[in-house]
């Protein structure tokens, strides 16, 4: 993103360093876990393994090579919460989520909202100082991003992916871009972050999650 752009919102300081999900299909779990930390106002990672275990159980899905539904993940956060990451660390090499031990404490819960009104809801949440999770289709160029780390009108579709919306900026020409937080580690793009245009979201995003602490 150009230094001449007008940064309207930037919530990166509210999060830990970007984590790496590795080969497991848990992007939605990572993004929702980050949002659960944010909504509880803690700058500390929460356990993805714990959340994945409960979400797969709620979904009655034993195929751990597939991703999870939004409804299962947000229900798991609302009903079971999450402990700190150190209580049940993530292992990218696992084929099956770990089973949690009993009496983990503390647990962090969030209630949720899901909407298809993507851009208007993102704007409202950012105005309120809040991050969101967006689910969208990915273009081919997602794997070859270079400076200024922007996605706009892109070709192809390599699958769906969940990320966290953490910022917004306006370019000198008036074009609006949103900052996304990925789950592919700090080596990807700009320390794990990149920018997507409003047009990109309008053409590729199909669900949005907002969450609040209990």
Where are these predicted regions, by residue range?
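Non-catalytic, low-structured ubiquitin/UBL-interacting segments
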Residues: 1-14
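Predominantly the structural core of cysteine protease catalytic domains
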Residues: 5, 23, 29, 33-37, ...
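Acidic/histidine-rich, surface-exposed loop or edge segments in extracytoplasmic proteins
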Residues: 12-13, 54-58
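Immediate flanking context of iron-sulfur cluster ligation sites
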Residues: 13-22
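Phosphate-handling active-site elements
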Residues: 15, 37-52, 174
């Amino acid at each position: 993103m150009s230094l001449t752009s007008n940064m309207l919102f930037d919530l990166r300081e509210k999060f830990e360093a970007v984590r790496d999900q590795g080969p497991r299909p848990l992007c939605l779990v990572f993004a929702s876990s980050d949002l659960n930390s944010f909504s509880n106002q803690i700058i500390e990672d929460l356990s993805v393994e714990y959340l994945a275990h409960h979400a797969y159980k709620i979904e009655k899905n034993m195929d751990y090579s597939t991703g999870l539904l939004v409804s299962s993940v947000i229900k798991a956060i609302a009903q079971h919460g999450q402990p700190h990451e150190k209580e049940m660390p993530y292992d990218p090499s696992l084929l099956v989520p770990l089973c949690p031990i009993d009496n983990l404490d503390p647990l962090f819960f969030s209630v949720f909202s899901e909407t298809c009104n993507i851009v208007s809801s993102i704007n409202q949440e950012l105005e309120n100082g809040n991050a969101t999770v967006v689910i969208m289709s990915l273009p081919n160029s997602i794997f070859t991003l270079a400076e200024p780390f922007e996605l706009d009108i892109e070709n192809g579709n390599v699958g769906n992916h969940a990320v966290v919306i953490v910022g917004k900026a306006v370019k000198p020409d008036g074009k609006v871009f949103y900052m996304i937080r990925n789950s592919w580690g700090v080596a990807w793009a700009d320390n794990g972050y990149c920018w997507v245009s409003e047009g990109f979201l309008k053409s590729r995003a199909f669900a949005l999650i907002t969450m609040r602490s209990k």
